[in-house]
């Protein structure tokens, strides 16, 4: 049995899609659907059971999972970088993850955890996923800090020898529609361009970057789940790994790709960055991918223009945009 926490969410539901693509349906989806639209991410998927997050947490707390579990893909977390409730993040992103990791270690189940590139803070220490760098990182927001604390705990307790914790960079692609303000700029741009014919980006607050010239490592969600599938097949590959393309691109590049995919000429306007984001905004991110490559991962990452074109034309423009 495979358990996917956050299985109705963005990357989680994409992982359920990948498992289905590989002929696997013995899947338990763990999530908190509440009043969100996440349920739509599951309509096309095949799995044996859905368990509410709180019920699952009780099972984990008592060490009493009613399945013979092969692997847990732990994508369940609060992923809002703007979340300000630190106690909630500590409980949801740290304590819950530690308990689940311990249970997997005890039972021999494969454990793959979602960390984040938000752990790298302002990037002044670079974006290396080696353990020495990890010890010195200073995240800019509480979300990144909660993810950093799990990785530090796993390192300190010797758990990184038996799990994979993945620092996802800027992920985009189908099944992110429920995320509101946390949707990728591609998803937002498609709607804004369709309605107004223009896309607005934040002006740069960094003297080294022009407006729209801030750079991020954008990775297609299908590539993320390919990496996780490979890790499931290679349980001896463990540690903290970056999951990005290793090639930073500008916001202008990204938005231009959306315009091109929509067969429109780019029209970009720049607006002031909200006060609450200033000082907490990463102007540059680029994954160092040597560690994952050296471990033997063969996944070839999709070029930005190709990923954006597929996302726009195959999904965003479709009657059913879901995987």
UniProtKB/Swiss-Prot annotation:
CDD domains named in the record: ADP_GME_SDR_e
Assembly and oligomerization: Homopentamer.
PANTHER family, A to Z: ADP-L-GLYCERO-D-MANNO-HEPTOSE-6-EPIMERASE, NUCLEOSIDE-DIPHOSPHATE-SUGAR EPIMERASE
Organism for this UniProt entry: Nitratidesulfovibrio vulgaris (strain ATCC 29579 / DSM 644 / CCUG 34227 / NCIMB 8303 / VKM B-1760 / Hildenborough)
GO molecular function annotations of the record: ADP-glyceromanno-heptose 6-epimerase activity; NADP binding
Record note on cofactor: Binds 1 NADP(+) per subunit.
InterPro entries reported for this sequence: Epimerase_deHydtase, Heptose_epim, NAD(P)-bd_dom_sf
UniProt comment concerning the protein's domains: Contains a large N-terminal NADP-binding domain, and a smaller C-terminal substrate-binding domain.
Protein name: ADP-L-glycero-D-manno-heptose-6-epimerase
């Amino acid at each position: 049995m495979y358990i996917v926490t956050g299985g109705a969410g963005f990357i989680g539901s994409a992982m359920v899609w990948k498992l289905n693509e590989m002929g696997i349906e013995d899947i338990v989806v763990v999530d908190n659907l509440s009043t969100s639209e996440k349920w739509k991410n599951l309509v096309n998927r095949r799995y044996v059971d859905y368990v509410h997050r709180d019920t699952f947490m009780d099972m984990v707390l008592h060490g009493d999972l009613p399945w013979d579990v092969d692997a847990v893909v732990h994508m369940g977390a609060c992923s809002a970088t703007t979340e300000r409730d630190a106690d909630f993040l500590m409980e949801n992103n740290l304590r819950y993850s530690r308990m689940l990791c311990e249970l997997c270690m005890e039972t021999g189940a494969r454990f793959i955890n979602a960390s984040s590139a938000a752990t790298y803070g302002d990037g002044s220490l670079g974006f290396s996923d080696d353990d020495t760098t990890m010890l010195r990182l200073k995240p800019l927001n509480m979300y990144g800090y909660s993810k950093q604390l799990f990785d530090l705990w796993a390192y300190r307790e010797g758990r990184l020898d038996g799990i994979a914790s993945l620092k996802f960079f800027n992920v985009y692609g189908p099944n992110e529609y429920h995320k509101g303000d946390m949707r990728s700029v591609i998803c937002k741009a498609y709607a804004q361009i369709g309605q107004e014919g223009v896309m607005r980006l934040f002006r740069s607050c960094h003297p080294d970057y022009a407006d729209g010239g801030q750079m991020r490592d954008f990775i297609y969600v299908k590539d993320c789940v390919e990496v996780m599938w490979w890790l499931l097949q290679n349980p001896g590959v463990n540690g903290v790994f970056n999951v990005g393309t290793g090639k930073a691109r500008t916001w202008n590049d990204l938005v231009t790709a959306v315009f091109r995919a929509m067969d429109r000429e780019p029209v970009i306007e720049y607006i002031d960055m909200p006060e609450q984001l200033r000082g907490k905004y990463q102007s540059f991110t680029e994954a160092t991918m040597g560690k994952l490559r050296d471990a033997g991962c063969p996944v070839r990452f999709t070029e930005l223009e190709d990923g954006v074109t597929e996302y726009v034309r195959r999904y965003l423009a479709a009657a059913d945009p879901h995987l």
